[in-house]
């Protein structure tokens, strides 16, 4: 893994910082595990914008990643590591002993030729997936399930991890990167280790066009708009003279938005960031 700072040969190159990994596969992805990925442009089935700042960008194919890791008792060998345009983490193509191939999230330190396994009898080493009742307290894990059998939902981005801090009956307590402490059923599965490609956070796109290649459109400030477009719009000068609100008039900048009371009982401590 190398951090490359581009020479300032043009204004668009001046601030670019790239993360280069020579171990990544340079060819095409494994075709049977690739699907078409249509772009929504941030629109729903009615054609209305439901998510702003999305549109355009390079065409991408979706790699089918195994988040469930439910092929128990069959060892697999890592064939290669690959880039995935749909996520910040890299993925690994693994070959199981019965001949099946699957993509998994590539943990930190995983390389071609390594052996991994899933199931209650799997060894305690990075890349192996076990129910959390079989993982020692204090371990760092990623790709953590929130419901048994649903597939990993927590800690899937590059460089992220969750720590198991306690085990109490049929639940384990997890410490998330945000500082939140949360209870999850101990039958839920998790993969040992942390997600690789932690250097992803060091990259700098360097110019607006690089964001457009990724399908990210500009974010315009409300104060720069007209009154018809935003509650902050219009007026003389830059002061909008009211509490900050969203384009639809709802309070923003710090207002709590969580409303799922059904799962509040599983949160031991609120997040700190």
Swiss-Prot record:
Per UniProt, the ranges with Low complexity bias are 39-48
**GO MF annotation terms:** rRNA binding; structural constituent of ribosome; transferase activity
Database matches in Gene3D superfamilies: 2.30.30.30, Nucleic acid-binding proteins, Ribosomal protein L2, domain 3
Q: Which SUPFAM superfamilies match?
A: Nucleic acid-binding proteins, Translation proteins SH3-like domain
Source domain of life is Bacteria
Gene Ontology, cellular component aspect: large ribosomal subunit
Region ranges (Disordered): 28-53, 221-273
Q: Which UniProt keywords apply?
A: Ribonucleoprotein, Ribosomal protein, RNA-binding, rRNA-binding
Q: Which GO terms describe its biological process?
A: cytoplasmic translation
Query: NCBIfam families attached here?
Result: rplB_bact
HAMAP family attached here?
Answer: Ribosomal_uL2_B
Subunit description: Part of the 50S ribosomal subunit. Forms a bridge to the 30S subunit in the 70S ribosome.
The text of the family note is: Belongs to the universal ribosomal protein uL2 family.
Known function: One of the primary rRNA binding proteins. Required for association of the 30S and 50S subunits to form the 70S ribosome, for tRNA binding and peptide bond formation. It has been suggested to have peptidyltransferase activity; this is somewhat controversial. Makes several contacts with the 16S rRNA in the 70S ribosome.
* Official protein name in the record: Large ribosomal subunit protein uL2
UniProt lists the gene as rplB
């Amino acid at each position: 893994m190398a951090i490359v700072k581009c020479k300032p040969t043009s204004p668009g190159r001046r601030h670019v910082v790239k993360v280069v990994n020579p171990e990544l596969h340079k060819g095409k992805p494994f075709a049977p595990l690739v699907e078409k990925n249509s772009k929504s442009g941030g629109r729903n089935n009615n054609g209305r914008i439901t998510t702003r700042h999305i549109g355009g960008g390079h065409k991408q194919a979706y790699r089918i990643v195994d988040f469930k890791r439910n092929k128990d008792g069959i060892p697999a060998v890592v064939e290669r590591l690959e880039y995935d345009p749909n996520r910040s983490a890299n993925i690994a193509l693994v070959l199981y002993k019965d001949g099946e191939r699957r993509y998994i999230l590539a943990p930190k330190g995983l390389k071609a030729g390594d052996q991994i396994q899933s199931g209650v009898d799997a060894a305690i080493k990075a890349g192996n997936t076990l129910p959390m009742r079989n993982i020692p307290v204090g371990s760092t894990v990623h790709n953590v399930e929130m419901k048994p059998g649903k597939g990993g939902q927590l800690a899937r981005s590059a460089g992220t991890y969750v720590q198991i801090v306690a085990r109490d009956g049929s639940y384990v307590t997890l410490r998330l990167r945000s500082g939140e402490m949360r209870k999850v059923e101990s039958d839920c599965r998790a993969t040992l280790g942390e997600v690789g490609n932690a250097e992803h956070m060091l990259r700098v796109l360097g110019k607006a066009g690089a964001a457009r290649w990724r399908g990210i459109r500009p974010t315009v400030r409300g104060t720069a708009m007209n009154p018809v477009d935003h509650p902050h719009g219009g007026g003389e000068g830059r002061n909008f003279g009211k509490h900050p609100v969203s384009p639809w008039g709802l309070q923003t900048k710090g207002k709590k938005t969580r409303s799922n009371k059904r799962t509040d009982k599983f949160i031991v401590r609120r997040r700190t960031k």
